[in-house]
Amino acid sequence: MAKISAKNIRPGELNLKEKLVHINRTAKVVKGGKRFGFNAIVVVGDREGHVGYGLGKANEVQDAIAKGVEDGKKNVIKVPIVKGTIPHQVIAKYGSAKVLMKPATPGTGLIAGGAVRAVLEMAGVHDVLTKSLGSSNPHNVVKAAIKGLQSMSDALEVAERRSKSLKEVFES
């Protein structure tokens, strides 16, 4: 799994909560029958702008979830949130999964399905419109949503990148 660069974020200092997105049972056929294993994709976040995801694999469900949580804590990113929503529209793609996220006015609520909803809830986004296109594989949908949130930048970051003031950015 590709690691996300988490610069200057210490998961130990955050009050991270976890949300299980999907459990998958796998089977290995051996001489004596089938041996089952499990993998779990888990989203962790503090509901205040930090979110990460992790994949855990084990022979027991609880062990897979625990491994997923530990992996998720290693992949935490900062999400820019403006008035409870995202700063701008974004389309992110991972594999065959595509996620469209649009900012929404306060009071709209979190309009998202399954895996994307879990990511946005853990990030602390309250008002957003989303549409999941292409593949509905929860693993790829979560990764596409995280990729989209990671690609966002707030107005201050854009101004710094362009070496302009905040006022100049909004006038252009």
From Swiss-Prot:
Record note on quaternary structure: Part of the 30S ribosomal subunit. Contacts proteins S4 and S8.
Lineage: Bacteria, Pseudomonadati, Chlorobiota, Chlorobiia, Chlorobiales
Example of a GO cellular component annotation carried by this entry: small ribosomal subunit
Gene3D superfamilies the UniProt entry points to: 3.30.160.20, 3.30.230.10
Domain statement: The N-terminal domain interacts with the head of the 30S subunit; the C-terminal domain interacts with the body and contacts protein S4. The interaction surface between S4 and S5 is involved in control of translational fidelity.
Record InterPro entries: Ribosomal_Su5_D2-typ_SF, Ribosomal_uS5, Ribosomal_uS5_bac-type, Ribosomal_uS5_C, Ribosomal_uS5_N, Ribosomal_uS5_N_CS, Ribsml_uS5_D2-typ_fold_subgr
Keyword Cell inner membrane: no
Entry GO MF terms: rRNA binding; structural constituent of ribosome
Gene from which the chain derives: rpsE
Name of protein: Small ribosomal subunit protein uS5
Function: With S4 and S12 plays an important role in translational accuracy. Located at the back of the 30S subunit body where it stabilizes the conformation of the head with respect to the body.
Domain (S5 DRBM): residue spans on this chain: 16-79
Organism listed in the record: Chlorobium limicola (strain DSM 245 / NBRC 103803 / 6330)
Record keywords: Ribonucleoprotein, Ribosomal protein, RNA-binding, rRNA-binding
Family note: Belongs to the universal ribosomal protein uS5 family.
BP terms from Gene Ontology: translation
Keyword Amino-acid biosynthesis tagged: no
A Pfam family this chain is assigned to: Ribosomal_S5
PANTHER family with a match to the protein in the record: MITOCHONDRIAL RIBOSOMAL PROTEIN S5 (PTHR48277:SF1)
